Amino acid sequence: MVAKLTEQERVEKLQPLLDAGWCLVEGRDAIYKEFLFKDFNQAFSFMTGVALLAEKMNHHPEWFNVYNKLQVTLSTHDVGGLSSQDIRMATYLETQAKLLH
């Protein structure tokens, strides 16, 4: 079963994501990042790849897309905050975004 990140895990695992441009969401235990792509096709292709992992993980991001902009919020609803699944998903998004740029 997935558990909410401990304080130690938050310190160790969140910092690399914060350094990469993710930010903590005010008022809730979640992280957020906005990704910009060349065009809609590139954004949609990125989202499709993320969707495949999300299905395998049974962990789905909250996201909003307009043309080449994708806004992503991650939090684990079952635990009421950030979990290792959010760290894994955010790390995957970072890796995939770097491949496109």
UniProtKB/Swiss-Prot annotation:
The keyword Ubl conjugation does not apply. GO terms for molecular function: 4-alpha-hydroxytetrahydrobiopterin dehydratase activity. It holds the Pfam family Pterin_4a. It catalyses: (4aS,6R)-4a-hydroxy-L-erythro-5,6,7,8-tetrahydrobiopterin = (6R)-L-erythro-6,7-dihydrobiopterin + H2O. GO terms for biological process: tetrahydrobiopterin biosynthetic process. Belongs to the pterin-4-alpha-carbinolamine dehydratase family. PANTHER family: PTERIN-4-ALPHA-CARBINOLAMINE DEHYDRATASE. This is Pterin-4-alpha-carbinolamine dehydratase. The lineage of its organism: Eukaryota, Metazoa, Ecdysozoa, Arthropoda, Hexapoda. The gene is Pcd.
